[in-house]
């Protein structure tokens, strides 16, 4: 399995950093050397700009959250966003999106559904 499928995608990880999630992980998203290239994964925290959390790391962070853990069905990872069922491409993405939703729900003056 490719490493990109075992960590949360760039956008979700960037949002986790913006939400001030502690940036400690095995892998990091690093800015490309050449402009216009895709961000790459590295284990070097010195050149990494923000954490690329693995399924296991996200599993530890989401342990004990309300609701069920993401489940796999019909080629997608599904999780509950309030009363809505949401699909993600990978388990890491589903766990990251669930954590983002939970953090936003806990923020004061949020607009996230509280169910």
Label the predicted regions.
Residues 1-115:
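Glycine-rich anion-binding surface patch
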């Amino acid at each position: 399995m490719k490493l990109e499928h075992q960590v949360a995608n760039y956008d979700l990880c960037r949002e986790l950093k913006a939400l001030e999630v502690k940036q400690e992980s095995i892998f990091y998203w690093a800015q490309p050397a050449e402009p216009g290239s895709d961000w790459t994964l590295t284990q070097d925290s010195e050149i990494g700009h923000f954490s690329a959390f693995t399924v296991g790391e996200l599993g530890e962070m989401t342990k004990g959250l309300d609701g069920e853990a993401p489940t796999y069905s019909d080629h997608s990872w599904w999780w509950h966003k309030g009363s809505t069922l949401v699909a993600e491409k990978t388990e890491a993405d589903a766990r990251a999106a669930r954590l983002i939703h939970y953090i936003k729900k806990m923020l004061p003056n949020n607009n996230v559904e509280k169910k």
